[in-house]
Amino acid sequence: MKRLHHILPIVLASLMQALPLCAQQPVAREVTNVKMIGIGPSNILDTYLSPEHYNGFELRFIDQAERHKITTSSIPSSMGLCYSPESSNWTTTLTHQAQISYSKPRSEDANYLYGLYSFILARQRHWHLMGNRLELKAGAQGEIGGGFLYNTRNGNNPAQARAYLNIAPNASARYLFNIRKMRAAVQYEAALPLLGVLFSPNYGQSYYELFSKGNYDHNIVFTTPFNAPTLRQMLSFDFAVKDHIFRIGYLGDFQQAKVNSLKYHAYSHLIILGYVHRFQIQKIRP
């Protein structure tokens, strides 16, 4: 019995040394970065500057980064190894967009120069079905943007400023498949703003009155689908060529508002070309 008391601590100490330090296993953050360029026709109406519809072409740059965590269990298995990594059910997506367009009315006696930058922060829950071939996502996003619209013909009030903030539910579906030996995926995503704020001058109000004299006239307007029905949707196809993933798709962006007795819309139909890059950022959990 006394001999057992001497052997037992030695055995326990050996077992503790053999167990892996699971608490120090790396925690990875998987990032999918997509850089896209879009080009296509656009249609702009802004009754503050002109009652005419202006048609032209738009060029848009999009940088999108989707992040989700991959965690490792801290409980060792019977083989002395930690359990396999588990992917988080939540993703965070950051999107930067910069767009410029050049358009003309039917009379072709004037031009619109349009520029806009927007930033989108989205959070989504995702589900995997059909043996991980189908991925569904749903969540919400916040978007902030600012830009300008300049009419080359107008002498008074030649430009219009754009600034907005909105919150929107979003959803997407992605299906993975193979074309012979080529890996591919088709994806659809959409967002529909429900609540936001928008800067707009009032009907007949000049920017001189607003900024030089400080005459505020309901220039910050709350927006809903009733006075600013807006939709952004994208259908894309990803395909792998060796170790590289490319994207081709369609982006439809329909921004519109009717506030302060003024009408505004910017419709874009863009062909999207992009490159998809996936990588992991490792962290050591203390």
Regions found by a protein language model. Give the residues of each.
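Outer-envelope beta-barrel architecture signal
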Residues: 29-35, 71-77, 86-94, 132-140, ...
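Short glycine/proline- and aromatic-enriched beta-strand/turn motifs that initiate or cap beta-hairpins
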Residues: 23-93, 286
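Extracellular loop and loop/strand-boundary signature of outer-membrane beta-barrel proteins
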Residues: 44-51, 62, 103-111, 154-160, ...
